[in-house]
């Protein structure tokens, strides 16, 4: 029987363009090269689950699953998924669906949350933004995920939210020079709103930033985002251990 430290985690990144997966150990070390397949169109639950199943079959074994999903999630249930372009995800229990598909315990978080868990230092207030098909955010204090507003769908101008202002479609439409002007403005806003100790930027468009960044801003390696799957399970184990300890303490009173 495996101990928690020996168990293998299938870490999945569900994106608007590609779905990627790899297997990690509990420390976040890659045990296999990551695999990817294009996100299907339309990206409804059945088609996305089929792609995930194809990816899972590329790995010989794993004991748990962690997945990052591009949308708002509550208790493992998808509430919105604007970057997958389909209302079919509303109130879809992705956790249950993956557990039934892969027959393994599963944790689901927003994709930016998974990235944030992977790369933050674990000290102070840290903000992660992802620049891919859309704009994602994760906020962590001392390495622990915090509830926060879904910034992507807040207005940044009179007519555009953050997704529409600096997302992949807009990058292609306005070009790199104008996109960088917008990103400079966005970072300035985030600095004032969050007063973060450190900002991390990842995603396919992060490499397109060409202006000088503050010393407390880091461009993260996209590949490192998978490691959030191990961190997610680590936090789950700590939370469960804390609950168990609290129950034992109350029984002794």
Q: In which residue ranges do the predicted regions lie?
A:
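Glycine-rich phosphate-binding loops at beta-strand->alpha-helix junctions
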Residues: 18, 190-222
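Helical "lid/coupling" subdomains associated with nucleotide-phosphate turnover
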Residues: 150-191, 217-241, 251-253
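A short acidic Gly-Thr/Ser loop motif
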Residues: 12-17, 129-134, 204
């Amino acid at each position: 029987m495996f101990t928690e430290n020996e168990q293998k985690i299938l870490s999945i990144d569900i994106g608007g363009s590609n779905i990627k997966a790899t297997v990690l150990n509990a420390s976040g070390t890659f045990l296999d090269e990551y695999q990817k397949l294009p996100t299907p169109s339309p990206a409804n639950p059945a088609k996305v689950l089929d792609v995930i199943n194809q990816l899972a079959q590329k790995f010989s074994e794993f004991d748990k699953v962690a997945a990052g999903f591009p949308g708002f999630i509550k208790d493992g249930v998808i509430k919105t998924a604007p970057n997958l372009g389909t209302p079919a995800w509303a109130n879809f229990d992705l956790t249950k669906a993956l557990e039934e598909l892969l027959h393994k315990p599963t944790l689901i978080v927003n994709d930016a949350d998974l990235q944030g868990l992977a790369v933050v230092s674990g000290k102070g207030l840290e903000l992660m933004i992802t620049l891919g098909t859309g704009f994602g955010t994760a906020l962590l204090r001392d390495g622990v995920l915090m509830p926060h507003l879904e910034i992507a769908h807040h207005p940044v101008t009179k007519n555009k939210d953050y997704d529409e202002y600096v997302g992949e479609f807009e990058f292609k439409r306005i070009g790199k020079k104008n996109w960088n002007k917008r990103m400079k403005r966005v970072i300035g806003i985030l600095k004032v709103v969050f007063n973060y100790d450190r900002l991390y930027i990842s995603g396919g468009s992060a490499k397109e930033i060409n202006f000088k960044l503050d010393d407390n801003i880091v461009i993260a390696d996209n590949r490192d985002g998978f490691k959030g799957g191990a961190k997610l399970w680590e936090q789950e184990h700590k939370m469960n251990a804390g609950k168990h300890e609290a129950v034992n303490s109350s029984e002794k009173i």
